[in-house]
Amino acid sequence: MSAAVQPLQIKILDPRLGTVWLLPTYATEASAGLDLRAALDAPMTLVPGDAELLSTGVAIHLVDPSLCAVVLPRSGLGHRHGIVLGNGTGLIDSDYQGPLLVSVWNRGREAFTIEPGDRIAQLVVLPIVRVVLQVVDTFVESGRGAGGFGHTGVR
């Protein structure tokens, strides 16, 4: 079974995308995220603790207000090299039309060099549900109740 496909408007801001480097693309048929590349002019070394804002060379417009996009880290970069997103997750609203920028942070112990065109993050498009707040005095009791962090244990 294949996933639903919808068009996504994209502006190419760096002419190397689609010529020297691939446009944002799904790595496999079942990938959830489009790989985003570092639109750098030269290699950039992140020493431990450094964070930089990198261009992906594209802008998107989701158009449909029932959609949003999230910029997520690439698992291998975080696990192997300590390179994660500086803001955890980037949320792209449907009405945003500016350049996609990625905050990369080296939380590792060694310097890491990002080369021009390297895949640095992934973009996942998600449906959203907008809510209307309903103020109440009490909640109908649930099985969990107000049990918070760690209340279910690890086993």
From Swiss-Prot:
Substrate binds at residues 74-76, 87, 91-93. Its cofactor is Mg(2+). The keyword Repeat does not apply. Keywords: Hydrolase, Magnesium, Metal-binding, Nucleotide metabolism. It catalyses: dUTP + H2O = dUMP + diphosphate + H(+). Coiled coil: none annotated. CDD domains: trimeric_dUTPase. GO terms for molecular function: dUTP diphosphatase activity; magnesium ion binding. Its EC number is 3.6.1.23. Pfam families: dUTPase. Pathway: Pyrimidine metabolism; dUMP biosynthesis; dUMP from dCTP (dUTP route): step 2/2. GO terms for biological process: dUMP biosynthetic process; dUTP catabolic process. It is an enzyme of class 3 (hydrolase). Belongs to the dUTPase family. This enzyme is involved in nucleotide metabolism: it produces dUMP, the immediate precursor of thymidine nucleotides and it decreases the intracellular concentration of dUTP so that uracil cannot be incorporated into DNA. This is Deoxyuridine 5'-triphosphate nucleotidohydrolase. It comes from Xylella fastidiosa (strain 9a5c). The gene is dut.
